[in-house]
Amino acid sequence: STAMTSPFRFAHAAHAEWTQAAQACMLQLGAIPSGATLGFLYVSDAWVGELDAILAFFKSTTGVSHWTGSVGVGICATGVEYLEQPAMAVMLGEFAAAAFSVLPLLRPPRDIDAQPLEGYFALVHGDPANSRMQELIEGLGARVTSGFIVGGLSSSGSENAQICDGVLNGGLSGVLFSERVRLATRLTQGVSPLGPRHRVTAANKNVIGSLDHRPALD
């Protein structure tokens, strides 16, 4: 048997006021399943200062206490992309309690060895301001039995806030899942560490053409 048999409930909305967007999401979610145990919440960075209140709203209205997520400069939902406007996307999953655990925030790599981390794979969010993020990802990958990690980096014009039951930043956070949870993934974007400091020598808006007079993808 699998640890989750019901489909995810999900919703998304854009509005100038987060309260209106959150209410719209609740209407889309409908009746909250009694078995909902884990929430996923992604919010535009325009609302980073309100993230504590947004998370508290969804905790109280859904009754779900465990949450993961992040802020981003854009929000992708089912067939919709929100850019340059405040928006949010929320999803609820019905997982057996023993099938997942919220990952504590990991800042220096030694935090990985200090935690009793057990899981088959992990969904994670990383703060790009942490200079040791690659070490954290590799270290966590060595601890999950599949060696498989999915997720992405937080993005923001200000604070790279993440959701890990509460609101925090500065490291790697997420959820560990057991082998009882079925997994299907798609790669939407690949990135590589830039290494030392470079000078952008050619660009078109937000697309970098060359670094230090060399093709950017070299």
What role is predicted for each listed range?
Residues T2-D52, A56-H66, S70-D218:
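Small-residue-enriched flexible segments
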